[in-house]
Amino acid sequence: MLKKFRVVLMLLCCSLFLVGCGNKSSENSVSEEKQPVELNISAAASLKEVMADLQAAYKKVADNVTLVVNYGGSGSLQQQIEQGAPCDLFISAGQKQMNTLKEKGLLVDETTKDLVQNELVLITAKGVEIKSFDDLKNSDIKHIAVGDPGSVPAGKYADEVLVNTGIKDSISDKLVFAKDVKEVLAWVASGNADAGFVYLSDALNNSNVNVVKNVPEVNEHSPIIYPVSVIKDSKNIEEAKKFEDFLFTEEAQKIFEKYGYKANS
């Protein structure tokens, strides 16, 4: 009888041990599963089309990460970040906005990098015939759309072009100012403005405008560089760094090139 009791007790102990191991294994598998992460990205309005493709591509390599993108003028986004709006990563269309955030200690400094370059172009509405900057002086050109130079990098670059080509004073009464480059594009595409200055990446993806002239950087405007940085107050700094690293991969850079951007050399 005692022998039988010992056998039963031994079997019971083995069963409890196996159950314990199973629970531990189950706990380990749960802990190894990737937890869902939501990253808040603040991106210049001009990035809207390319970001859609980048989001889809990143989902394939990090399916637990959801990218929530807030688009706007770079100056407006800068102010939102300063005021504490949720943001893990910022992609600006100009250095000025990023530099301001850096000076205020709001960035993870080692993550602040130049991502891609863009190009400024002069566009017109369909049916509007101009061939040069001087043609903007023509009496039939009533409205010329530009981004607000104070908050929109494309507007600042356009202002530099108008000053450096010597035509700003003669067309200043025709200028209409938009909150971001997408609004400039919409005004020209709809015919509400006769001409405007946008990025090449915007113009390439809109069949309702004509590209009149590509504006070279030399002597006409400063380089158009899109910097990127992780925000210091991010609650997901490591995940934000991983997404930033992805933006510099060959796959991501090819997506940028498809939309008219250039790799930053």
Predicted segments with their positions:
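Bacterial N-terminal signal peptides that target proteins for export
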Residues: 1-9
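Periplasmic-binding protein-like
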Residues: 88-92
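Short, glycine-/small- and polar/acidic-enriched structural segments
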Residues: 111-120
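Conserved beta-strand core positions
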Residues: 39, 65-67, 120
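Signal peptide-proximal N-terminal region
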Residues: 56-68
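Conserved strand-loop elements at the edges of beta-sheets that form or border functional pockets
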Residues: 71
